[in-house]
Amino acid sequence: MSNVASFFKQPTKFVLSAVQKAQYPNIAFPEIAFIGRSNVGKSSMINALFTKKIALTRNTPGKTRQINFFNHSDKLMVVDLPGYGYAKVSKKEAGEISQLVSNYLSSRLSLKKLFVLIDNTLGPKDIDLEILEYMETIKDRIVIIFTKKDKKIKETSEKTEKLKNNYENFTISSKNNDGIFDVQKIIYNIL
């Protein structure tokens, strides 16, 4: 078994859920975070990467409303950020979630990679592009993950091609683990 594969089989423990900056854990190791529209497959991807169920998958999108921190083998902090763009939250709740994520992204010096997940079957939506534009200052730490590779897409959009040309990116399927090892290698190399 490779070092990469064995690393991802090590234990991962839930640390805490934060709804404000003061609750973020103090850590001495690198941090990676995952963000994407509601129902993009973020929790499924996290579970596939770490070869165990650490992030809750739900049938109802838009349920993660706090920042969830996980400690992987005392070597890596894994952060599950709330999904964005879910229509069934109030404007007030959407604003609170947006502020929570904004505070996190602007304050975490330990953040080494931000994985932005986009549904490959739908392509990037305006809200995805707005999020990427907002995060322009950390562009060098962003990796775009196109999810749901196992599902049929109609055609690749111009927006998708532009993102693929401007960002490090991978297309994955959490369902059959296609592309997961490539993302694991990226994560392993930041340690």
Question: What do these predicted ranges mean?
Answer:
Residues 51-52, 63, 94-97, 131-135, ...:
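Glycine-rich, phosphate-binding/catalytic loops in enzymes
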Residues 63, 76, 83-86, 121-123, ...:
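Conserved nucleotide-binding/hydrolysis micro-motifs of P-loop NTPases
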Residues 70, 147, 183:
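Residue-level signal for inorganic ion chemistry
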Residues 73-111:
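Conserved nucleotide-sensing/catalytic segment adjacent to the nucleotide-binding pocket
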